[in-house]
A protein has these predicted regions:
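Beta-loop-alpha module in the N-terminal Rossmann-like domain of NAD(P)-dependent dehydrogenases
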Residues: 1-52
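Contiguous beta-strand/loop segments that form the cofactor/metal-binding neighborhood of enzyme cores
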Residues: 127-173
Length: 173
């Protein structure tokens, strides 16, 4: 709270576990601080929408820490597509997994700490794939395979827009 009240601080960097992002971000915004937040910026769209409203009212800035847009491979793919080497992109498929040793007490497997594949690595996959769609999807289908704790061990996502562009994503941890 002292940090939020400090007039010498203009921006807050939030690198706490996912489940606390919303409260910290909202508190910072209500104290007129800009916020740079690690992914996932919030655990659902309702939390983000509320923060965006505060941002608009107070003329602040929020940003998330999805770094893939700055990586050399992403820049190369973007260039290849922009030069039309591949023709029109109609489908993007992303398979993204990482291995986390199963530990019921680890935040990655804890539903109270916003664990699971979607909130941990899904942000990267969805951001990457959505970047190449001309418009937002009209159809969103998802499925998941849970760990015993209830968080998603694996998730499948299908997105489709009016231009008939399709995104297929598979995540696992």
């Amino acid at each position: 709270q002292a940090m939020f009240k400090d007039g010498n601080i203009d921006i807050v960097y939030n690198a706490t576990p996912h489940n606390s992002h919303y409260e910290i971000m909202k508190d910072a915004l209500l104290h007129n601080k800009h916020v740079f937040c690690e992914k996932a910026i919030t655990i659902n769209s309702y939390e983000l929408e509320e923060c965006v409203e505060i941002v608009k009212e107070r003329h602040l800035v929020i940003s998330d820490g999805v770094t893939l847009f700055h990586m050399p491979l992403f820049k190369r793919v973007k260039k290849v597509i922009s030069l039309n080497y591949l023709g029109p992109v109609k489908m993007v498929q992303v398979n993204f997994g990482n291995f986390k040793e199963y530990d019921v007490n680890n935040r990655f497997f804890n539903p109270n700490l916003a664990g699971g594949a979607l909130l941990d690595i899904g942000v990267y996959a969805v951001s990457f794939a959505r970047y190449f769609m001309k418009t937002k999807p009209d159809i969103v289908l998802t499925t998941m395979i849970p760990f015993e704790t209830g968080v998603d061990e694996s998730s499948g996502i299908l997105l489709q827009n009016k231009e008939m562009e399709i995104v297929i994503i598979f995540l696992t941890m």
